[in-house]
Swiss-Prot record:
This is Hapalindole dimethylallyltransferase. Prenyltransferase involved in the biosynthesis of ambiguines, a family of hapalindole-type alkaloids. Catalyzes the reverse prenylation of hapalindole G or U at the C2 position with dimethylallyl diphosphate (DMAPP) to generate ambiguine A or H, respectively. In addition, accepts hapalindole A, an epimer of hapalindole G, and catalyzes normal prenylation at its C2 position. It catalyses: hapalindole G + dimethylallyl diphosphate = ambiguine A + diphosphate; hapalindole U + dimethylallyl diphosphate + H(+) = ambiguine H + diphosphate. Activity is slightly increased in the presence of Mg(2+).
Amino acid sequence: MTIVNRIRTDVVNVAKSFGAEYSEAVIDQIFQGFGEKFTNTGFAIRVQNKRNQKVDCNIRYGEAKENCLAWDIARESGLLSDQGHPVDTLIQEMFQAIPAIAYGADFDINYGLVKIWHLPKIVPVEEAFKIPSLPKSVNAHIDFFKKYHLDALCALTVDYRNKSTNLYFDAHHPEQRTTQFYKNILQSQQFEVPSDEVLEILVNCPEIAVTFNWSSPGIERMCFYTAFVNRETVPQHINPVLKKFAQEAPALLDNPGFLVGWSFGPDAKKGTYIKIDVDYHGLVVPSFFHMHNLPLPIPEANSVFDLPSSDTEDKLNSIVMS
């Protein structure tokens, strides 16, 4: 079995195990365009319980390239076409406004291409204001960004399905290491505040994402990302999806790392849910720590650190974002 076929089989098996809807035709189209990319970049399989606890399955990859190859491949393969909406030109504007060190793409296996990521070096959030087609609500939240220390921009995405955009921030400020910070920022948007136990997990969050769209003046969602270096460190008792995926998720490593996104929004926008990615090749979690200038808690837990030093930097720059 080739590595591409193994990945495809693992993806379908995850969908079946979690009861996630999928389309063989959609998966075929995704793998025809991007299958080879999944074999040698930061690749992850994700499950998330966003639709009334129904689990969805996504796959994503990131690659250290200055140009956005995903946009070209998606257009050529029929996964992306114009919608008569600002999302049509937004990713190109992002790459023109802010130099990139990497890009990425995210796919729903029952839908197709969902997002394309733009990954620069960490830059001031003001750099994003130069992007012409961003929703006006982004600029309108300058005071919000200042108040909550969301000033170090580390990634942007275009969501083609939901017609929205995400800004990702490096959580570098001491206040972001407190539970009160997460209570305050969620309450500021009238989003649900999680349990004290989850709040204690969030204080170790290196990355905060904020979602905006063109149809609303407010913030659509917020998500806080945490990384875990192996199956045992995932807080499996918090949610059955976390437990099942941490124990069963396939990977080329015996004991892979995981990224967990704790996502919050108003009830009308799917409320609160969890998303968890398995680091299939052992590149995603080290890249995540590297991107945020953090030491990997257990270096030996991921094979990337066994590579020759000249390869390690290249591999760490194959960043995968949420």
